[in-house]
A protein has these predicted regions:
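Surface-exposed alpha-helical segments enriched in charged/polar residues
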Residues: 21-22, 209
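Short glycine/proline-enriched coil/turn segments at helix->beta-strand junctions
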Residues: 25-28, 51-53, 288-289
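Gly/Ser/Thr-rich loops at beta-strand to alpha-helix junctions
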Residues: 10-15, 19, 25-26, 30-44, ...
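Short, surface-exposed alpha-helical recognition segments that flank or form part
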Residues: 8-11, 339
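N-terminal juxtadomain amphipathic helix
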Residues: 1-7
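Non-catalytic alpha/beta scaffold blocks inside enzyme catalytic domains
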Residues: 66-216, 246-363
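Anionic-ligand anchoring segments at beta-strand to alpha-helix junctions in alpha/beta enzyme folds, i.e.
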Residues: 30-85, 212-251
Length: 363
């Protein structure tokens, strides 16, 4: 089975890696899109430093909203295990990614063993018609809504009513919510940046801070992408900054607008795009003058790519270290269907071996 291509022609992996290295070495503004495990992220950041590239997550917008909450405003959060054991009121804020529906169902099936209350109550913040992840045993979440108002506006109204202030439109079922909070020992708000705007995340943290004036409350961050959040953590311990960092000036430079890789590609700033995705991804449109290097789980060359190298999927084709939202930390995973496909880190190291460590960085 072919695993590497230069253009549409099959090639040896070594030769394809050397060609990718030559393209990177001649690029004036390379950008990387990451969707990979911890080892792949670390290798990609090391390569970015060597060639002066900027790097971001493949779905950078959602991840940027989440990182901005922590870098710009700060957040009060709790671990998933503490949520399972202590949360007697669970508030689902907006829509959660599908991968977390099972976790919410487990919360509905269990009771907090470190709480005096032997039950959990569920609420959902969102517009009319919003639906919570399925709760087992026929349970439903009580909707807290301001009609068709946005999530941010609903959270603002919820916060105002909690503080006893007037609102232009009351939040539905607020009395039930206030009663549950009064009896709660530890309410937890589940949130994600996947479909939640930045101002809504900030307003949520304001509400949590208000609750902590008289009692305890916290939020549980459920990342829009587990790979993305793992990459953000790896980037932070390697450079001091999360994703959307660049090395164009020879040192790590964090700028969430400037190094928004999707924006850089759309505006024509980037002349080379290295996309690293250890899961199967559909072909993406690219600018005609921009070279594309694709490291992806694929059986054929990616359309329009100058170089394509097939890589395995973390936890499927090879062992890996990944971020786990169930534990709120990193964990190692075994290969579920081990194959001969190389890991992203292996290929990135191979590409880097063809680039001089003393190579001049772009201006």
């Amino acid at each position: 089975m072919a695993v590497a291509w230069i253009g549409n022609r099959e090639a040896l992996v070594e030769r394809a890696a050397a060609h990718a290295a030559a393209l990177l070495g001649s690029s004036r503004c390379p950008v990387f899109s990451l969707d990979t495990d911890i080892h792949g992220t670390r290798a990609a950041i090391a390569l970015a430093e060597r060639v002066g590239a900027a790097y971001d997550h493949a779905d950078g917008a959602a991840l940027s909203r989440e990182t901005a909450l922590f870098t710009d405003k700060g957040a009060m959060t709790v671990a998933p295990g503490e949520t399972r054991r202590r949360a007697d009121v669970v508030v689902i804020v907006g829509e959660l990614p599908q991968i977390y529906h099972e976790f919410v169902g487990e919360l509905a099936e269990t009771v907090p063993d470190l709480s005096a209350k032997n039950q959990r109550e569920f609420f959902l913040v969102g517009p009319n018609g919003a639906s919570a992840p399925p709760l087992n045993n026929g349970r439903t979440a009580t909707l807290l809504s301001c009609g068709e108002a946005s999530l941010g506006a609903t959270l603002a109204a919820l916060r105002a009513q909690y503080r006893g202030r007037q609102t232009s439109q009351p939040v539905s079922n607020f009395d039930d919510f206030a009663k549950a909070l009064a009896a709660a020992r530890f309410p937890v708000f589940l949130f994600s940046g996947d479909a939640t705007e930045g101002l809504a995340l900030e307003m949520l943290q304001g509400l949590i801070a208000d609750l902590n004036r008289t009692s305890r409350a916290s939020g549980l961050h459920l990342p829009a992408s587990e790979n993305g959040w793992g990459s953000a953590l790896a980037s932070t311990w390697m450079t001091g900054f999360p994703l959307r960092t660049g090395f164009a000036r020879g040192f790590p430079d964090f700028d969430p607008w400037r190094y928004d890789v999707a924006r850089m590609i759309a505006s024509g700033e980037a002349d080379l795009h290295l996309r690293i995705s250890s899961s199967i991804v559909p072909p993406q449109k690219k600018r005609s003058r921009m070279a594309l290097i694709a490291l992806a789980k694929t059986q054929k060359p990616v359309a329009g790519a100058a170089v394509t190298i097939a890589i395995g999927e973390a936890g499927v084709d090879h062992e890996a270290v990944v971020y786990s939202s169930r534990t709120g930390s990193l964990r190692s995973v075994d290969a579920r269907a081990k194959s001969e496909l190389p890991s992203a880190a292996t290929i990135i190291h191979l590409v880097a071996s063809h680039i001089s460590a003393e190579a001049a960085l772009p201006c």
